[in-house]
């Protein structure tokens, strides 16, 4: 714990989020901007707020997030993972509920690398019979 802030690191795809939470009125600031300005899609906003709504802490904490790497979906997932870890740092009794919802587990799926001789990771060149 840093001062009165609780900390959690979240990761998803190639995005990394450093999340700091403290008691407040529910403001979420991502890279210096309000969350509604940073994430354009409503689904991204919903993903980020899931752990707070599950634990009934949506208006309880002020949250500051530094997130880098990846795209919008990856960053939203990383922020959700970081908020989950910060909530557990704040109150360990929340872990079972968050774990049952699947928020504690890091989503290990990464982009598969492109292979030599193929167009993409698995897409082969078109076969020509003649």
From Swiss-Prot:
Cellular component GO terms held in the UniProt record: cytosolic small ribosomal subunit
PANTHER family (UniProt xref): RIBOSOMAL PROTEIN S9, SMALL RIBOSOMAL SUBUNIT PROTEIN US9M
Protein name: Small ribosomal subunit protein uS9
Family note: Belongs to the universal ribosomal protein uS9 family.
MF-aspect GO terms: RNA binding; structural constituent of ribosome
Ribosomal protein is among the record's keywords: yes
Highest taxon in the source lineage: Bacteria
Residue ranges the record marks as coiled coil: none
The keyword Acetylation appears for this protein: no
Gene: rpsI
UniProtKB keywords: Ribonucleoprotein, Ribosomal protein
GO biological process, one term: translation
InterPro entries, per database record: Ribosomal_Su5_D2-typ_SF, Ribosomal_uS9, Ribosomal_uS9_bac/plastid, Ribosomal_uS9_CS, Ribsml_uS5_D2-typ_fold_subgr
One Pfam family hit: Ribosomal_S9
